[in-house]
């Protein structure tokens, strides 16, 4: 704890915050992500939980993104990738040959995860995302089947509004494919279902203003951030402990948590400067400074107060708590912007971070 809080205070050039950070962690008000525990304030690894890459449709770029994912895994992160730009199996390629399709390239990432460990702590993990209207979608849903060459990957299917509506309206082929999605979830617990239009309707205003599309989520499917060929999104995560909500709700805890995560992000930026395979993630971190302050212990708070999980009182408390978290974190990012400046993407927005909250 001392190592982590010292590093965070130093990154903010505010040594006086060390004690406050330490108190929050020791009291159990804030729970840190595994990479922060393992790597913050050390010379090894990075304190970031998750990464996502946008895989382009050329051999050179695919191999570069594979190298990026291997490096991200090596330094301690969970990884994911969007494969919707890859051409379908059997389509023509520039040397008069035929493409082996999006799913075949996922095998490279599957093999990498079987080989590389996350900062020497745990086996690598990767989630592949593909659009349901991609011609290789049916083959994609066979991942993890008995006998399938891909066994280690997690996978998510992207479903746009138009496709869902046509399926509901009775399109026979779409209904067959949707049945296969549901069957796969029943048998394997996968794919994640990612409703792309819904996600993009609810993304932060800055992403709407710059028309930045969110094409995929992360390994755990709780982060909604945009990636592109030259920017790979990262998740800078920790959680507030709702079981102890009554202890910290009238304190500066949420503000301190946002400050702490911004310090974690600053450490990531400093450590990845000049790293060839982490340049896209470094660029995203600098330009977006996206944070994900989540929660844990929600059920414990309800049990402690003897509140039924599905009752109206629980719903009202949910609204109260998350409104409080949002208000406090918004004020914190505005204060950070005044103290340290706005990043490139947020010039004129009066804030330091594109996102603040996660699950």
Task: Please place each PLM-identified region on the residue numbering.
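Extended catalytic cores of very large enzyme megasubunits
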Residues: 1-359
């Amino acid at each position: 704890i001392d190592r982590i809080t010292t590093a965070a205070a130093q990154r903010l050039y505010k040594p006086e915050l060390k004690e406050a950070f330490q108190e929050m962690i020791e009291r159990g008000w804030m729970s840190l992500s595994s990479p922060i525990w393992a790597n913050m304030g050390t010379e090894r690894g990075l304190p970031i939980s998750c990464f996502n890459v946008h895989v382009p449709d050329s051999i050179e770029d695919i191999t570069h993104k594979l190298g990026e994912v291997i490096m991200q895994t090596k330094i301690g992160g969970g990884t994911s990738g969007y494969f919707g730009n890859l051409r379908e199996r059997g389509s023509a390629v520039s040397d008069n040959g035929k493409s082996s399709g999006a799913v075949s390239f996922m095998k490279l990432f599957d093999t990498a995860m079987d080989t590389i460990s996350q900062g020497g702590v745990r086996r690598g993990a990767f989630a592949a995302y593909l659009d349901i209207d991609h011609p290789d979608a049916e083959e994609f849903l066979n991942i993890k089947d008995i006998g399938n060459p891909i066994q280690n990957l997690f996978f998510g299917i992207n479903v746009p509004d138009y496709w869902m509506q046509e399926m509901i309206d009775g399109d026979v082929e779409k209904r067959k494919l949707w049945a296969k999605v549901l069957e796969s979830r029943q048998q394997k617990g996968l794919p994640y279902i990612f409703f792309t239009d819904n996600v993009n309707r609810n993304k932060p205003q800055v992403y709407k203003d710059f028309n930045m599309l969110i094409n995929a989520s992360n390994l755990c499917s709780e982060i909604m951030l945009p990636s592109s060929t030259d920017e790979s999104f990262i998740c800078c995560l920790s959680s507030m402990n709702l079981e102890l909500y009554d202890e910290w709700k009238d304190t500066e805890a949420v503000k301190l948590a946002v400050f702490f995560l911004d310090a974690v992000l600053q450490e990531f930026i400093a450590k990845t400067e000049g790293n060839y395979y982490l340049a896209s993630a470094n660029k995203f971190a600098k330009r977006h400074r996206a944070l994900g302050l989540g929660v844990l212990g929600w059920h414990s708070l309800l049990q402690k107060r003897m509140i039924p999980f599905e009752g109206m009182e629980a719903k009202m408390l949910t609204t109260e708590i998350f409104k409080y978290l949002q208000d406090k974190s918004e004020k914190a990012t505005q204060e950070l912007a005044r103290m340290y400046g706005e990043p490139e993407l947020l010039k004129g927005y009066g804030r330091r971070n594109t996102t603040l909250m996660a699950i």
